[in-house]
Curated annotation (Swiss-Prot):
Transmembrane annotation, as ranges: 6-26
Residues the record lists as binding NADP(+): 285, 540, 602-603, 608-612, 644
Gene: ccr1
Pfam families in the record: FAD_binding_1, Flavodoxin_1, NAD_binding_1
Organism: Schizosaccharomyces pombe (strain 972 / ATCC 24843) (Fission yeast)
Cofactor binding mode and count: Binds 1 FAD per monomer. Binds 1 FMN per monomer.
Name of the protein described by the UniProt record: NADPH--cytochrome P450 reductase
Domain FAD-binding FR-type: 267-514
């Protein structure tokens, strides 16, 4: 072949290659891409995205957000209701008066502290309740600017607080006052009664059909339609620097977190415990004291604030769930999770792994929801397991007896209904859509910020509950995680007495010996030193009061005159579970007669004696201090102790002319009555 023929052949090959590339890649029509309009106006965004409903959440720990997404998913699946979930603080809602009257607003609102809005809902409440609020059309509150707007609302609260579900009630009242009309009942979820899930299901089952009627939407019961695509990427190593292995944010993964960025669950401080003690070990009960270094965190706390601990799930729980799903061999397989509708938010940071999702990002140790079991039933491996899951999902009494009362998690229920066959057909996306995300746990800081500005002290009883007749043990998530750190810190060969194991080294061994945490502000504040205080805190409820007394002792040591500081403390035995027993005497030595500790040991006599009984025994002292302007504090169990203490206080304050409960309310209104209960 001659030279020019070679050249001609090469040219033909090049042209053919170019044509192939152009025809198959460059000239390939692109799939239509749906983009969310960049605006902070809900009115504009809903119009641009052709949405029928906007679902808002006001959430402190993420629970209200989880419910909002669950509602959004079910509304789309069962009623074809086009909607999107929004964080209240991310949007300018002054133009809500221009909201399309043919559309719907839905609110999921948690109440925080003493009837306060969550941080991300504070501005929204101020907008609705402000006397000088002017909306975009120029209308004020008195002009009923929301006339014709329809809304639905579900609140998350705790009935043991006086201001039960105050946020939902306030927003509901404000929306009505502004002219809006509520669809369905005002949903009031009660976390204290353990009925939050059931309260939500009842409200949702009543409200969704009402919404369907409003928009002429027929309820459809179609097969499961995933919101997210879960794509396995076996070609990507789980050691790749791009894979999330438990990092709480993209900035954390990349290592470029701004030094002054606010601390939160997405940007926790990794604190080194500098001291740890087990204050008592009594049978199956033990109590921890941990001191966490925050010197380089950029955080500052005030006495009475919370230490927010970001836990992880124990390895045993992760293994159990992976095994029952048939994913144990794939635990380290890299997966990418993508929303099918680009309006939706990805539920986890990805790429990640199956192991990581269950270890760090989701709550897998808590009681499984009844609704999730009913969703899983069609994917059960056997007819028998399907039938059992359907019964658990549809019969609340049966579910309560066999799941709630035993504190069973998802893996434990699935293993019981199908001991031999794994749930290999269960879509992973269904779990991502319906399980709760991992949330921080709040612990009252047990130190004084004046005495220990660079250290946060945490006091916690390790949670363990055993049903010997059922061969089942429930372990508290965060307290057992902290116990593992405590044992690790002391270098014990058996790191955990309950046999639980944790990857304390964290992702890529970057957390070794450190606990992810941040400080959460509280309204539980120590009164000025010249104000008498009465504190009631049995068990670990004494934690914030240790900080209070510590601070007053510090002030007294500097010559500051301190008013009466009266502490009522209770536990089971004086020689077994008396927290900080020697320490109280040290404070007494400094504070002298201004400090008094009154104890109640419930099991040292034939009849039980609790702190409320001691209050009644010291009625005259308490009444006198209240008359002198004392502040009254309660910390601890909400279901029984707090109620009994309030009743005792009301009894003490009752006179011929004064109703005791009204007197307690007057203390609240005067900012002299504080509760921190759970």
């Amino acid at each position: 072949m001659k030279t020019y023929e070679y050249v001609l052949l090469v040219i033909i090959l090049i042209l053919s290659l170019c044509y192939f590339i152009y025809n198959n890649f460059l000239n390939k029509p692109k799939a239509p891409e749906r983009r969310v309009v960049a605006t902070d106006s809900i009115v504009e965004l809903m119009e641009a995205e052709k949405l029928t409903a906007a679902v808002f959440f006001g959430s402190q720990t993420g629970t209200a957000e989880d419910f909002a997404y669950r509602f959004s998913t079910e509304a789309k699946a069962n009623f074809n209701l086009t909607n999107m979930v929004f964080d209240l603080e991310n949007y300018d809602l002054t133009d809500l008066d221009n909201f399309d009257r043919s559309k719907l607003l839905v609110f999921f609102l948690a109440t925080y502290g003493e009837g306060e809005p969550t941080d991300n809902a504070e501005a929204f409440l101020q907008l609705l309740e402000g006397d000088d609020t002017v909306f975009s059309s120029g209308k004020g509150i008195e002009d009923t600017p929301f006339e014709g707007i329809r809304y639905a609302i579900f609140g998350l609260g705790n009935h043991t607080y006086e201001y039960y579900n105050a946020m939902a009630k306030k927003v509901d009242a404000a929306m009505t006052r502004l002219g809006a009309t509520r669809v369905g009942n005002l949903g009031l979820g009660d976390d204290a009664a353990g009925m939050l899930e059931e309260d939500y299901l009842q409200w949702k089952d009543d409200t969704l059909p009402e919404i369907g009627k409003l928009f002429h939407l027929q309820e459809v019961h179609k097969e499961y339609n995933p919101m997210f695509e879960v794509i396995e990427k076996p070609e990507i190593s789980n050691t790749s620097s791009t894979v999330f292995l438990g990092e709480p944010s993209r900035q954390q993964l990349k290592g470029n977190v701004a030094s002054k960025a606010p601390r939160s669950q997405a940007n926790p401080f990794f604190s080194s415990p500098v001291r740890s003690l087990e204050l008592f070990k009594s049978g199956s009960r033990n109590c921890l004291h941990l001191e966490l270094d925050i010197a380089d965190s950029g955080m500052r706390y005030q006495t009475g604030d919370y230490a927010s601990i970001c836990p992880m799930n124990p390895s045993q729980a992760v293994d159990d769930l992976l095994e029952v799903l048939g994913l144990k061999e794939k635990r380290d397989t890299v997966i990418i999770v993508k929303p099918i509708d680009t309006l939706d938010k990805a539920p986890v940071l990805s790429p990640t792994t199956y192991d990581t999702v269950f270890r760090y990002y989701y709550e897998i140790c808590g009681i499984v929801s009844r609704q999730l079991l009913s969703f899983i039933a069609p994917f059960a491996p056997t007819p028998e397991s399907k039938q059992e899951l359907e019964k658990l999902g549809n019969d609340y009494d049966y579910f309560k007896k066999n799941v709630v009362d035993l504190h069973l998690n998802l893996a434990q229920v699935l293993r019981r209904v199908s001991p031999d066959a794994p749930f290999t057909k269960l879509p992973f996306s269904m779990l991502l859509e319906n399980m709760a995300h991992m949330k921080p746990r709040y612990y009252s800081i047990s130190s004084s910020s004046v005495v220990h500005p660079d250290k946060v002290h945490v006091t916690a009883v390790v949670d363990k509950k055993e049903w010997t007749d059922k061969n089942h043990i429930f372990y508290g998530l965060t307290t057992n995680y902290l116990l593992a750190h405590c044992r690790h810190m002391h270098g014990e060969k058996i790191p955990h007495p309950n046999g639980l194991e944790y990857t304390l080294e964290g992702p890529r061994k970057n957390w070794t010996g450190k606990i992810p945490m941040f400080v959460k502000k509280s309204t539980f504040r120590l009164a000025p030193p010249d104000v008498p205080i009465i504190m009631v805190g049995p068990g670990t409820g004494v934690a914030p009061f240790r900080g209070f007394v510590m601070e007053r002792a510090n002030l007294a040591s500097k010559g500051v005159k301190v008013a009466k500081t009266l502490l009522f403390y209770g536990c089971q035995y004086s020689d077994k579970d008396f927290l900080y027993k020697e320490e109280w005497q040290q404070y007494k030595d400094v504070l002298k007669d201004s400090f008094e500790l009154i104890t109640a040991f419930s099991r040292e006599q034939d009849h039980k004696i609790y702190v409320q009984h001691r209050l009644l025994e010291h009625s005259d002292t308490i009444a006198k201090l209240v008359e002198e302007g004392a502040a009254f504090y309660i910390c601890g169990d909400a279901d029984h102790m707090a109620k009994d203490v309030v009743n005792a206080l009301a009894s003490i304050l009752t006179t011929v002319d004064v109703d005791g409960m009204k007197a307690v309310k007057a203390l609240r209104d005067d900012n002299r009555f504080f509760e921190d209960t759970w």
